[in-house]
Every structure is written in C-alpha cells, then in structure tokens.
Amino acid sequence: MKTIIVIGVGAQGSTIAKRMNDHPAVSEIICADFDSKAAHELSRSLDKAKALQLDARDVNNVIKAAEGCDLIVNGLPLEFNLIVMEAALAVHASYLDMAGPMESIGFVESYKLIFSEWHKKFEEKGLTALVGCGSSPGLANVIARESVDKMDTCDTIGIFVYEGVWTERFTPFWWSPEVAFGDMAFKTFRYENGAHVTDRPFSRPVMMKLRGIDREVRMVDHEHDEPVTMGLLADKVLKGVKNVDFKYGGSGVELAEVLYKMGLLSTDVVTVKDTRIVPMDLVLKLCPPAPKYPAEIKSIIDDGVILEEGAFLVRAEGHKEGSAVRIDGYVNAPGLVESFEKSNLSHEAYLTGQSGAVFVQMLVDDAFSEKGLFVPEQFPAAARRYCFQELAKLDITVDETEESY
C-alpha cells in the first residue's frame, strides 16, 4: 500500500487525487495546497484523503509535509519544481510533475541539468522521477516515441494543438490565465537542423487543415517542453530526429497575440497619467479566472456553449524500408460538455488531469520502475502500451494513420 501527497490541488492535481482514491494499492492521499479551502473541499470528497495547508516556497515545509510518503505528485507552477524534487529526495519518495523546470539558467539548460545531475540523484537513491507527464507534454511524447519506433530514421516531429471553445460567458482560458499569458509572451523554442533555436512569441505562423475542423486554422510557434526534451534525446530514443516544433492555435492564442502586440503582456512598468502600471498585472486583474469548481463550470455551460472544436495531432516524418513515411497520431478526448457530464471537469482538466493520473497510476502499479529521472519519450514499449490501454478506459484514444510517399 502506498501513500501519496498531491501538492497543488487545482484542476490537474484534484483529478489525480480523485483517481488515486479509487486505486486499491493507495492507502492514503494527502491533499496539500496553499489554499486551505481547496485542500479541505477536495479531501472531504475522498475517503482516503486528508487536507494540509502548505506553503511550498520553503523546502523544509515540503519535506515535513511529505514525510512518510511513497510518491509526491507536484501540481504547482514550474518555479516550484526543483524545490519539490529536493524534498522528494530528502524523504525518499518518487516524484511526478506535469511540466519541466524553467530555471533562470534557461529552458534548455535546466533540462540538461535535470537529465544529468538530478537523474543521478534519483538513481543513486533508488527512486523514480517522471517529468512532464500531462497531456502535452506527456501523452504527446508517448505518441511521438510510438510513431518513431515504427521508422528506420526520423527527420521531423510536430505537435499541433488547436483549442476553440467559445461560450456565451467570456472564458478565455480553462487553466491559469497567469500561466497561459506568461507562456505565450515567452520566447519560443524549436529544434531545427539538430540544434535548439529560440524565436519571438507567435513566430512562424502557418495555416493548417486539421481533422475535425472544417477550415484551415492559423497555428504559431509556442514555448513548450517537447522541442527541448526531444532535441536533447534525439539520438538516444528518437532515431536522430533533426527537427521538432510545437504549434498552437485557437481563441486563447489569438487573444494573447493581440495583447502581446499592444504591449499589454509586458512586465515592464509604464506610466499612464502619472500612475505606474505593469501592463501584465492589469491584464491579469481584468481577465476572468479559469473556472475551478464544478458549480462554476456548470454555470458557464448553462449560460450557453457556442462552439466546441479542437485538434491534437502528433506528426512524425522519416524513412521506413527505403521510402519516406508520415505517421499521424490524432488524440480523441471528451469535449467540454462531455467532460463535465463524465467527471465534473472541463475538457482541459479532463485530458491533462486524466493523462497525469494514468502516469501516476503507472508508478503505483510499478508498470515503470526504472530508477532515475525520465520524460515520457524515454518509456519502453511495455510502459507506453500500459498508458494507451489505461487512457482508453477513460475515453482518451489515439487514431494513427501511416502514409508512404
């Protein structure tokens, strides 16, 4: 029997806690959050859980909270990752998060650091740490590796995510607006011709026809983990891939791009009529928060859903048996209304949270037990098969097509 602490019980963390509450090999779940109300509300709905108010800015607080736990699930913002990793090592617990670190040394450099020094730390302690285990990064990486393994060599991997959910009530984001705007205003990363390249936000726009959308949609480069980790692991697990990019599109991207071009996502102080203002602070003050509780999501749905459309594609291109080959993996998952009917979650929380829960379950079930620090594209075939099988039970599936040309 295993004890799990979930630190950060927002949409993804709470989903994982609920799923693990039903797992027969889990004896106790600690729901820890700075927001005491959120922790207690979640714990009251789970028969194996207890609530804990936690300020994770101090590693000693995290160590004290996690003492005796077998696994730490980190649902906090990126800046907490290394703090929580340090605590996991201190209490001899395995570790999982849903996106990698972005330390001041740089996105690529921070991944190099955890792939080397932190991998060794977890390996020497006989522990497993999984980084970037949500939907994207996470499921996207598993799909990419699955496709690449069918090829002799791989040239290009592209991850394309389009989100177009329009509701009568203005709801620009279904996850933290602070994280969303911050990510979109950050420089982009891609892996190009065997090297990591940075670019300006919203760079290299393309029009694409994606399955399930009856028109071409605009997609732009976006800061994300996959080009970084896949580039670093290109020769080890992705058959020498030379190009990896992540493109994003949809209503939230379009809004953010307009605000960015107006300077409203800047964190530099400006003076307006003798008042000093940080534009990003103003935007975040005025932006509606993401719906957090079921009653909030239900209220938005009841007010009216105008349009639900989206696509999640992982495309790998390379060579197989002397011919050029393209393998497309389209993810199928419940939309907003269906996700809420199934689990009182938004579509965003359902896909990312349930994907994260399957990765956690994989550790609980010892379906992946290698020691050290890993990202999902490093999973062997058996672990990938486990992920696909368990996700299918949650109506998250992948349609794969292969085309030679």
How would you label these PLM feature ranges?
Residues 46-58:
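Rossmann-fold cofactor-recognition segment
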Residues 99-127:
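Rossmann-fold NAD(P)-binding glycine/threonine-rich loop
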